[in-house]
Amino acid sequence: SSLLSIPSLSLQYNDKLKVGGNSLRFSKEQSNTFSNAKSSCRISMVAAVNVSRFEGIPMAPPDPILGVSEAFRADTSDAKLNLGVGAYRTEELQPYVLKVVNKAENLMLERGQNKEYLAIEGLAAFNKATAELLLGADNPAIKQQRVATVQGLSGTGSLRLGAALIERYFPGAKVLISAPTWGNHKNIFNDARVPWSEYRYYDPKTVGLDFEGMIEDIKAAPEGTFVLLHGCAHNPTGIDPTPEQWEKIADVIQEKNHIPFFDVAYQGFASGSLDEDAASVRLFVARGLEVLVAQSYSKNLGLYAERIGAINVISSSPESAARVKSQLKRIARPMYSNPPVHGARIVADIVGNPALFDEWKVEMEMMAGRIKNVRQQLYDSISSKDKSGKDWSFILKQIGMFSYTGLNKNQSDNMTNKWHVYMTKDGRISLAGLSLAKCEYLADAIIDSFHYVS
């Protein structure tokens, strides 16, 4: 039998057309029409149902970060600036593929590698490289096989694996999240059904770190709470604790028997040094604490679309690390089966090849340096233009690709509606999407929005 269609015949859903059992039942008049149509070898049947089974599903709100880019693309103004999404751009505001990434991809082509499935835990060479990059190759935790590393779908997917582990094996545990934090953190823990609350972090009065509030809230949390920490370049504020403050944070977490859960999305990209940006994580591991760490290579290698990252669990014994790894694999299997290979090979080749590794560090320093230059230029432009006496030095004290401007929602809306500057509504701007040439324009927009919009 074949499926034949008659464009002219459309069967509308009404009281004469009934669905019953496995067949459609027609009135006598409709049956004759149907028979005539069938005899002409051209049948078209479209059952238009008035009410969808999905009618009760509400429309989801646009993503607060990715939605910024959608609005930016719809704007036809020549002056428009996209400072919403954290993706590195050149001085010409073009996407940048690292030269070292191109070299690694050429090596892969020369080897003629296949596209077979990876193991559930990912590419072994990547997992080894990423743990060593995070902790240092000579770290006792690695040598003692106390690190369970599973390749995840970039930072988001790796955090999600960690959240699922908490939900499954730490019933009743809560996660403490900084106020503010990256927009997706709360979604991830909500989706994993892990309860969370916030600890104080940003002080709007000083546009700096509320360190006393942070310590008080971590102390007040029930024993055994998971504390989500940004390893470096805090998103969205760009405000990091000092080394001395990290020591105090570690003291309190250790005293309260909490479990630190680090999100390391910018290793090497914040300061330009891979080791400096991993110092906070290494401090906690050196203290003998058991630690969870999610990693991402979206920013520091520009592998945004490759979705390459890892979840690392540093345990107190090799036996517990092995059990944790087995359960992370068990969680990953029904979620996505196994991770993508392309980005994993890029990372493994670059970290494992001394020449490529050195080249990567040079490129990373270049990218971090460009952002530092833009940060300085923006501060200089605002300081020279604004005669109000306001102290804008917080811009220089922040680190990484973001600056937390202190602008409220109305002021951020003015930035977009009047100045065509697209940013998140919490006042965060991505300096990675700014050029030196655009700093004067952005300074005018910030000054106008800050002083003339409440």
UniProtKB/Swiss-Prot annotation:
The modification N6-(pyridoxal phosphate)lysine is found at residue 299. Its main location: mitochondrion. SUPFAM superfamilies: PLP-dependent transferases. CDD domains: AAT_like. Keywords: Aminotransferase, Mitochondrion, Pyridoxal phosphate, Transferase, Transit peptide. Transmembrane segments: none annotated. GO terms for molecular function: L-aspartate:2-oxoglutarate aminotransferase activity; pyridoxal phosphate binding. PROSITE patterns: AA_TRANSFER_CLASS_1 (PS00105). Pfam families: Aminotran_1_2. It comes from the Eukaryota. One of its GO terms (biological process) is 2-oxoglutarate metabolic process. Residues 1-49 form a transit peptide. It is found in: Mitochondrion matrix. Its EC number is 2.6.1.1. Its cofactor is pyridoxal 5'-phosphate. L-aspartate binds at residues 86, 182, 235, 428. It catalyses: L-aspartate + 2-oxoglutarate = oxaloacetate + L-glutamate. GO terms for cellular component: mitochondrial matrix; mitochondrion. InterPro entries: Aminotransferase_I/II_large (IPR004839), Asp_trans (IPR000796), NHTrfase_class1_PyrdxlP-BS (IPR004838), PyrdxlP-dep_Trfase (IPR015424), PyrdxlP-dep_Trfase_major (IPR015421), PyrdxlP-dep_Trfase_small (IPR015422). Important for the metabolism of amino acids and Krebs-cycle related organic acids. In plants, it is involved in nitrogen metabolism and in aspects of carbon and energy metabolism. NCBIfam families: PRK09257.1. In eukaryotes there are cytoplasmic, mitochondrial and chloroplastic isozymes. Homodimer. Belongs to the class-I pyridoxal-phosphate-dependent aminotransferase family. This is Aspartate aminotransferase P2, mitochondrial. It comes from Lupinus angustifolius.
